[in-house]
Each structure stands twice: as C-alpha cells, then as structure tokens.
Amino acid sequence: MTEKQKLRMVLLLQNECNLAKAKEAYEFVIGSDAEDVPVATGTGGEHKCNVPDPRKDGVYLRYSDGHEEWFDGKNKKENVIGIAVHLGERHTCIAKFDVEDDDEGDKEFPLQENNNSDTEEDKKAFITSYFDAYNDLDGKKHTESLMRRGCKIPLAENQYIPSQGEWLLVLMFFKKVQEALEYACGEMLKDDWYWSSTESSSSSAWGVVVSYGSISYSIKTNTVRVRPCLSCEAI
C-alpha cells in the first residue's frame, strides 16, 4: 500500500468505517486549497506540481474487447461489460448487473447452505479483523473455495464474488461508480445488503450495506444480493 492508501485506511478505521467522515478527515489532512499546491510556470503554461494524474486512480468503463477507458461521461456506451476501479496497485471490476436466477427470478441468495465440508485449510482463510478484511483482495480464490464447498449462487463464467477489500474500493468511489453504471445502462447498486466472499467463520461471512457503507458479518444462510466481479479471463 502507498502512504496515502495507508492514511486512508487508518482514517476509515478511526471513523468507524464511516466513509463520509473518513473522506472529510483525509481532505483536511492532505489539504485542497490552491495556495497549498506549488505552481510552476513556463512556456508550457501553468502546472500544479505534486498533483497525481487523475487518470491513474478512479473509475473506468471496461469493454468486451478488454480495454478500459477513464469514465468522463463522454465514453461510448456500446459493449461496456463492467465498471472498474483503480487505486494505486489495487483494482477490481464489478459487473453491470446483480446476479439473478434465470429460472426463479431470485436476486437474493445464501452464501452457503451448510458448513459440513469446511477443512482445516479452508478455516485458515477466515478473517475476523476489520483491518485484514479491508486488505483482502482474494475474491476469486475465495469464490472458488466456496463453490467447492457447495455455494449455489448462479455466477456466470469468469465471474466471482468480490472480497471485502474489493468492496472497499467500490465504496470509496461509490458515487462515481453509480454514475458510471447508470451511464452504461447497467443496474445501479441497491440500498441493500451485498455478500462478499471474505469469510469470518464456518457459519458467517462479511457483507456490506450499500445504503450507508457499513460492513459486518452475516450468517451464510441469510439470503443477500450479489454483485459479481469480472475476472481477468472475462477481458
């Protein structure tokens, strides 16, 4: 993690996972006043020094041919398959729609109906710490493990359930992600619970409440929405 990412993480934890308060604290610490930013002038015009390229971190549209474009509201809408988020070396890409059972029309699913098949190796992946959960980006690996142990969520090929760390990336850019989903004719995230693939025990896993950015454990047999991620193979 970069120093700025570490600062964001600390502020998020100190503000009890309240994204709005954490963002306000971050902006206060970093500073956003024009006089705080060194300005270099020359024949090329003004350039604000030490300002990161805004195209590195943020929200992108991913297309069916594999390329991604920085989302600016002027992109072409055809063939968009997902909304990608990049923050330093971290990145994820969510699909345009929640998982839906084509036969029953259900949009809420249990993560796992029983835990009888958990091995000691499976249990080593359980995460109970908020900080560790935020740093968990192994959604694809966790999903493969859940499927092996009986998860019945009807994911499409090359889809997986996002880890808690991947959800954090989405929530950090939530408003822009919602804007991109609407722009690309996708399904905006609902004010509801969504599963992550990060497990906390044999009987529970982490989830997010999109309406106010809260995260917590939930019993795996509870029926909850799923917004899948797209794996690299989907590109």
Kindly give the residue locations of the regions a language model identified.
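An exposed tryptophan-centered "aromatic clamp" motif
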Residues: K140, E144-Y160, Q164-K220
